Structure formats: C-alpha cells, structure tokens
C-alpha cells in the first residue's frame, strides 16, 4: 500500500511565510527556508510552497526561493504561484523543485497542463483547485482563481476530471470555506473528488486536530494532507501526528 503523506504548506508573500483565515487577514509566520528545514527535520514527507501573491500581481514565483530550499532540504517539494508557461516550469525544476503547482494559469490555458505533462512527465505537474461551496447547493463547489479572489463559475468536480484527462499527476484541493479555520477538512468535497479521479488528491484547508487528519484519510480518501496553521502555530508537531496515525493503523512513514 502506498504511504499516506503529511505535507506542510508554506504560503509565501513578499518573501515571508504568511497564514490567514479564508484566504484573508494574513499574519507573518516566518522565513520560508528556515521553516522548510524545520519541517524536514521534524519528519515531513514533502513540502509545498505557494506564492499567494504571484498570480494576483502577475509575476513569477521566485526561482531564488526554490534554489535556496533545494540546497537546504532533502525531501521533495512543490512550488506554485504565477507559473504560466513551460519555460517557467523548466526554470523552477532546474532550480531544484520536484513538482510545480498550476492554478489560475491552468484555468486560463488548459493546454498548459498537457504541454507541461508531455515535456516533464505528469509526476511533476500538480493542479491546485481552490474550491468554495455554492450557496444553498449541497454537494456543489465552484473553482476560484487569482488567489481565491475570482469565481470562475466552473464546477469543481468537472474541472478535477478534466485536469486528470489533460495529464495532471496530482490534485491539490483546497476548501476555501475551511482554509485557516482549524475546524476540520471538508470531507464531502475531498471524498467527492477522490471518488471520480484516479490520481492522488492532496486535501487542504481546515486541519485543526489529530482526528481531523485521520478523518480526511479514512473518510475523505485523501492521499495526502496539507498542514499549515496547526503546525505554524505549534498546536501539533509532525511527530505527534505520525504517532497518532500509526496507532490508528494507517500506512504512514514512521517518524525518524
């Protein structure tokens, strides 16, 4: 059985890690490379860096951050934010990133998914989907872009299936309703997407307790859990999380 993954997420703005609630009210959480090293040492399986301002300000994710991180950590990491061309992806992978995450650019130009998948292999291409529940519509979500500021009107489940067909290797699925709240993942959303695609789904948005993480694996059928606020705020450690999940008999890589 493939091991389930715990992935700290570092949202970056202006060169600093930030975290907010529902994509707003951002607060400083530290230096990205320092935090990356800390989480790597503490047993993270992978890392994700998301430049949350890049898409809004139409500028590329900093290759410098990738280069610094690649020299400092030994675990795989993904970088996303403002990546809108095959050449940008090439620059980031050459700088040391293992994967890239495409969000707004994939919606604007879906061909970028297939082009980049052919060029670099689908294992390098993660499609980030920022999902928000439709008002008064149970079981329906819409895709948001531009750092969660713009509603595309695209149905999340239809988009998830399409990106898989275009060559995505993974889906990074964020519940905008749960982001930063620490009230639990959106299990209905996560399971709904996991049930219709055959590629791994990384659940994001809402982790606040050991039980939340267990539930998103067991009930949500996620392949990986993204963790941010509860780690940055030192509410839980990766060792505590892994110990708990191993006691629950989930296939987690042991803390070393």
UniProtKB/Swiss-Prot annotation:
Residues forming the catalytic site: 11, 130
- Which superkingdom does the taxonomy of this entry point to? Bacteria
Q: In its keyword annotation, does this UniProt entry include Lyase?
A: yes
Q: In which pathway does it act?
A: Amino-acid biosynthesis; L-histidine biosynthesis; L-histidine from 5-phospho-alpha-D-ribose 1-diphosphate: step 5/9
Please provide, alphabetically and separated by semicolons, the GO molecular function terms listed in this UniProt record: imidazoleglycerol-phosphate synthase activity; lyase activity
Q: Which Gene3D superfamilies match?
A: Aldolase class I
Which of the seven top EC classes does this enzyme belong to?
lyase
Instruction: List localization entries.
Output: Cytoplasm
* UniProt keyword annotation of Cytoplasm present: yes
Q: Which GO terms describe its cellular component?
A: cytoplasm
Q: Which UniProt keywords apply?
A: Amino-acid biosynthesis, Cytoplasm, Histidine biosynthesis, Lyase
Look up the EC number in the record and give it: 4.3.2.10
| Any one GO biological process | L-histidine biosynthetic process
Primary localization class, coarse: cytoplasm
| Covalent S-S links between cysteines | none
Q: Which reaction does it catalyse?
A: 5-[(5-phospho-1-deoxy-D-ribulos-1-ylimino)methylamino]-1-(5-phospho-beta-D-ribosyl)imidazole-4-carboxamide + L-glutamine = D-erythro-1-(imidazol-4-yl)glycerol 3-phosphate + 5-amino-1-(5-phospho-beta-D-ribosyl)imidazole-4-carboxamide + L-glutamate + H(+)
Function, as annotated, reads: IGPS catalyzes the conversion of PRFAR and glutamine to IGP, AICAR and glutamate. The HisF subunit catalyzes the cyclization activity that produces IGP and AICAR from PRFAR using the ammonia provided by the HisH subunit.
Q: How does it assemble?
A: Heterodimer of HisH and HisF.
In the record, the note on similarity to other proteins reads: Belongs to the HisA/HisF family.
Q: What is this protein called?
A: Imidazole glycerol phosphate synthase subunit HisF
Q: Which gene encodes it?
A: hisF
């Amino acid at each position: 059985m493939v091991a389930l993954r715990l992935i700290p997420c570092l949202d970056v703005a202006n060169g600093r890690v930030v975290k907010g609630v529902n994509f707003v009210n951002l607060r400083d959480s530290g230096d990205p490379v320092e935090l990356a090293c800390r989480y790597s040492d503490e047993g993270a399986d992978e890392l994700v860096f998301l430049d949350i301002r890049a898409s809004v300000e139409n500028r590329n994710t900093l290759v410098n951050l990738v280069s610094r991180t690649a020299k400092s950590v030994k675990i795989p990491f993904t970088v996303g934010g403002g990546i809108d061309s095959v050449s940008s992806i090439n620059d980031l992978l050459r700088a040391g990133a293992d994967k890239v995450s495409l969000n707004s650019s994939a919606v604007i130009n879906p061909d970028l998914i297939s082009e980049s998948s052919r060029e670099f292999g689908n294992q390098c291409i993660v499609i980030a989907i920022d999902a928000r529940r439709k008002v008064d519509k149970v079981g329906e979500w819409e895709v948001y872009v531009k750092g969660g500021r713009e509603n595309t009107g695209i149905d999340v489940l239809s988009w998830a299936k399409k990106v898989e067909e275009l060559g995505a290797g993974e889906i990074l699925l964020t519940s905008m309703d749960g982001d930063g709240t620490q009230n639990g993942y959106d299990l209905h959303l996560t399971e709904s997407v996991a049930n219709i695609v055959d590629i791994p789904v990384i659940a994001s948005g809402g982790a606040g307790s050991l039980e939340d993480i267990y539930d998103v694996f067991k009930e949500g059928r996620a392949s990986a859990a993204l963790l941010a606020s509860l780690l940055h705020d030192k509410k839980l450690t990766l060792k505590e999380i892994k110990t708990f999940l191993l006691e629950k008999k989930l296939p987690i890589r042991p803390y070393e």
